[in-house]
Design a protein with these regions (language model features):
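Membrane-embedded alpha-helical bundles that constitute the cytochrome b-like, heme-associated redox core
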Residues: 2-231
Length: 231
């Protein structure tokens, strides 16, 4: 009887994975870089509670010519890594519609949902490690930090409502809410640009190209091209 229940459970799980393979694949790919971040964390329960969790420090080369290397805390390195992956996944999400326009292949809602969950997870961890490294009050001392927090809060709303129940409950309002994903992209670029913590220009270029592809002129041009090819 137990073996029968176990086999039935495995069958249900396998069928779910087959049905939602796009969601599962996106989540796995998205969370793989977290392994590197988790490796920075050291657990030691032999001493007092204050030392149970610690993170190694790293020596980072200067970003500009002539700039001396500097020592970065493990939490600081985690802030950098999670922040970079957060903005990468934000750009990936915003690139899905342009990809659909160019190829005629529309990513499923579940792939978009998984990408959104991944982006929000990295953004949440980015803020968490920042609080560990600098303290949460530091968030309100610079405009770049405030803009980043605003982007993370909007992403939280999008992540919470990224399901079929919310779509049915909110109806037309759901699409309006999820258009704020574009604002998240803009805020994320501003966040990085104002703080000068990374190379934000490639992300800006990709986003601008994506917005141009979404334009009515470009959509009509693509549609006309496909019609001519089919005739």
């Amino acid at each position: 009887m137990v073996n029968g229940k176990s086999a039935n459970s495995k069958s249900i799980i396998m069928n779910w994975i087959k049905t939602n393979w796009g969601w599962v694949t996106t989540i796995i790919i998205g969370f793989l870089p977290l392994i590197g971040v988790l490796k920075m964390i050291n657990l030691d329960f032999s001493e007092t509670a204050e030392t149970w969790i610690s993170m190694d420090s790293f020596t980072m080369p200067g970003r500009r010519p002539g700039e001396l290397p500097k020592v970065v805390t493990g939490a600081g390195m985690a802030v950098k890594e999670t922040g970079e992956w957060a903005i990468r996944w934000i750009v990936i999400i915003l690139s899905m519609t342009p990809f659909s326009i160019l190829t005629g292949k529309k990513p499923s809602l579940w792939v978009r949902q998984a990408a959104g969950i991944t982006a929000f997870t990295y953004a949440g961890l980015h803020f968490l490690f920042f609080c560990v490294d600098k303290g949460w009050l530091e968030t309100f001392k610079e405009m770049g930090f405030i803009i980043g927090l605003a982007a993370a809060l909007i992403m939280m709303v999008l992540a919470i409502t990224s399901n079929t129940r919310s779509m049915k409950f909110l109806r037309k309002t759901w699409k309006k809410i999820h258009r704020f994903a574009y604002l998240v992209g803009v805020l994320a670029i501003l966040h990085v640009a104002l703080l000068e913590h990374g190379d934000w220009m490639p992300y800006l270029i990709i986003m601008v190209i994506g917005f141009l592809i979404r334009s009515t002129f470009f959509k009509r041009s693509i549609s006309g091209y496909r019609t001519r090819r089919q005739s």
